[in-house]
Amino acid sequence: MARKQVSRKRRVKKNIENGVAHIRSTFNNTIVTITDEFGNALSWSSAGALGFRGSRKSTPFAAQMASETASKAAMEHGLKTVEVTVKGPGQGREAAIRALQSAGLEITAIKDVTPVPHNGCRPPKRRRV
C-alpha cells in the first residue's frame, strides 16, 4: 500500500528580538520553552527529548544541553534578549540559565514563578530507601 505524501509546514522565520524563556525544572526532567512576549512558542527542548533517559534526565548537564538547543533554535528567529521564568524545584535550574547566557542570549530578568500552595493538596509521603 502506498504511503500518503504528508506536507509539512516549513517554519516561517519570525524576526523577534525580545522573548521569554520558560524553564520548568522538576525532579525528573527539565523542559525549556522559548516564546515571544505574547506566549507564542518559538522553540522548545527537554532533557528527555535529547535522549537522556531515567535518572540522567534530571541532571544539571541534561538541563544545560536542553537549554542550549532551545536557545540556538530561537536565535534563528532573530532572538537577542530574553526574560527568564523558572518554575519547579529541580536540579537543572541554574544550569539552564547559565547555558542560555553562554549560548549568546542577553538575560534581562530572572523570575521564580514556582507555584506555592496555601496548604492545598497533601504532599506525597517521605521516601524510605
Swiss-Prot record:
GO biological process: translation
GO cellular component: ribonucleoprotein complex; ribosome
Gene3D superfamilies assigned to the protein according to its UniProt record, in alphabetical order: Ribosomal protein S11
This protein's UniProt keywords: Ribonucleoprotein, Ribosomal protein, RNA-binding, rRNA-binding
Keyword Ribosomal protein attributed: yes
Keyword Ribonucleoprotein found: yes
GO molecular function: rRNA binding; structural constituent of ribosome
Disulfide topology: none
InterPro entries given in the database record: Ribosomal_uS11 (IPR001971), Ribosomal_uS11_bac-type (IPR019981), Ribosomal_uS11_CS (IPR018102), Ribosomal_uS11_sf (IPR036967)
Similarity annotation: Belongs to the universal ribosomal protein uS11 family.
NCBIfam families according to UniProt: PRK05309.1, uS11_bact
HAMAP family on file: Ribosomal_uS11
Function: Located on the platform of the 30S subunit, it bridges several disparate RNA helices of the 16S rRNA. Forms part of the Shine-Dalgarno cleft in the 70S ribosome.
UniProt protein name: Small ribosomal subunit protein uS11
